[in-house]
Amino acid sequence: MKIRIAARGSKLSRIQVDMLGEKLKKIGIEYEIIDIKTKADLFSTEPLSKLGKGVFEKEVNEAVLEGKADIAVHSMKDILSEINPSLEIFAVLKRDPPYDILIAEKNLDKLDSNITIGTSSIRRKNFLKYIKPEINTKDIRGNVDTRIRKYLSKEYQGLILAEASLKRLNMTMNYHRLNVYDFTPEANQGIIVALGRKKDEKIKEIFKEINHKDTLDEALAERAVISLVGGGCHSPIGVLFKKEGKEFYGIASYSDGKKKITVSISKPGDPYTIGSELGLLLKKEMKNEDIIP
């Protein structure tokens, strides 16, 4: 059997598909890649905030819905908006490091004033503005290679990226991992997900064999927070869960650049209940501080 996998045509996306494909090969399943151009690819110089929701996912998911592919593979942080009701999560791979990193000559505490840090994430911008208001941020688009090239050419004095991206690309840049209390990661950062059609029971059963349950539980808890509070790649909300045994450890943060709220939770339970509880805590604190998301 050969499974058709739809994904963006970028280098990082291809690596992510191959990571999942290797898991399939180990259980005797072959795969082929269907390259898809997304809105984010077609408008690669536009700020993400101007492109709306689903810019990394819509066209890829449509290929599955239209029967051109069997599975859509994404960085799970890119699909925080509601998934099409005809699709569902078939599997996730074991999570890579979920952290944000700073690529710069100095660590965050020692950065000079009035330098420019490249990031297109409103979450990262606001967290940085809260911690270091004297530092400037500037939108940066393009793949990781392009961003690093701009940094090395001194167009930016630093970059904030996802650590998982560098790991998957096998890049050896020196970087500083950012504290999760200062830079709580985007929900589902570091997770690769496979979506399929709900009706495809045969393929669904295959993907159960490669699913990493603890990672999926962490992802679902984080998504419950985002669903309750409202968020995604255009929102300044960070949330991270770690599951150890039956225990969930979670942290969620929100910042408008002037104020910052962080809440946490530690208890056993199911992902949806724990995530919803953390989301309610965050909403309550946001209301107390007169912050409207």
UniProtKB/Swiss-Prot annotation:
Protein name: Probable porphobilinogen deaminase
Gene3D superfamilies: Periplasmic binding protein-like II, Porphobilinogen deaminase, C-terminal domain
Species annotation: Saccharolobus islandicus (strain Y.N.15.51 / Yellowstone #2)
EC number(s) given by UniProt: 2.5.1.61
Entry keyword annotation includes Transferase: yes
UniProt superkingdom: Archaea
UniProt gene name: hemC
InterPro entries (UniProt xref): HemC, Porphobilin_deaminase_cofac_BS, Porphobilin_deaminase_N, Porphobilinogen_deaminase_C, Porphobilinogen_deaminase_C_sf
Pathway entry: Porphyrin-containing compound metabolism; protoporphyrin-IX biosynthesis; coproporphyrinogen-III from 5-aminolevulinate: step 2/4
Lineage of source species: Archaea, Thermoproteota, Thermoprotei, Sulfolobales, Sulfolobaceae
